[in-house]
Amino acid sequence: MKTLAKVGVLVASMCLVLPAVLNAAEKKEPAGEKLFQQHCAACHPGGGNIIKPAMTLHKKDLDAHGVKTAKDIVGKMRNPGPGMTRFDAKTVSDKDAQEIAEYILKTFK
């Protein structure tokens, strides 16, 4: 009887722990990357720019245009120049815009 109880406890423990282990093992796409793919990648594949090739999302080009911080990138999203879609807060929330901006700065160096 004690062996059966131990097996029951072991099975119950595995049922509780296994889902957490499987979730941790799953590769999760960072929020910024997912949002970038959803809203930006069509015109900025790989950090490039299919409309204005000289205005990429790479650090040297961002710096050349006075875009140095995540706040600057969000500002460009909200009030872009000619040729870029405007992403207002109804289209991309402030939180999501910040995630995208941080992803850009981290990814396209």
Labelled PLM ranges:
Residues 1-28, 76, 103-109:
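Post-cleavage N-terminal segment of exported redox proteins
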Residues 15, 23, 64, 88-91:
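Short N-terminal micro-motifs specific to bacterial/archaeal maturation
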Residues 26-27, 67, 93-94:
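Short coil/turn and helix-start
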Residues 29, 33, 45-75:
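Gly/Gly-Pro-rich "capping" loops immediately C-terminal to redox-active cysteine motifs
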Residues 32, 36-46, 100, 104:
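The canonical Cys-X-X-Cys-His
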Residues 51-60, 75-109:
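Axial heme c-ligation environment in periplasmic c-type cytochrome domains
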